[in-house]
From Swiss-Prot:
The keyword NAD is annotated on this UniProt entry: no
Keywords from the named record: Chloroplast, Plastid, Ribonucleoprotein, Ribosomal protein
Gene Ontology biological-process entries: translation
Family: Belongs to the bacterial ribosomal protein bL36 family.
PROSITE patterns reported for this sequence: RIBOSOMAL_L36
Pfam families in UniProt: Ribosomal_L36
GO MF term list: structural constituent of ribosome
Protein name, per record: Large ribosomal subunit protein bL36c
PANTHER family: 50S RIBOSOMAL PROTEIN L36, CHLOROPLASTIC, LARGE RIBOSOMAL SUBUNIT PROTEIN BL36C
């Protein structure tokens, strides 16, 4: 999980999801997991 100021999709399988007021990226590739901090 990378915590970044700006999250974006890295590949086509990345999905932007809003959970508990935070924007997250979930993907089949674990390296692409991100959260907005």
């Amino acid at each position: 999980m990378k915590i970044r100021a700006s999250v974006r999709k890295i590949c086509t399988k990345c999905r932007l999801i809003r959970r508990r007021g935070r924007i997250r990226v979930i993907c089949s590739n674990p390296k692409h997991k991100q959260r907005q901090g």
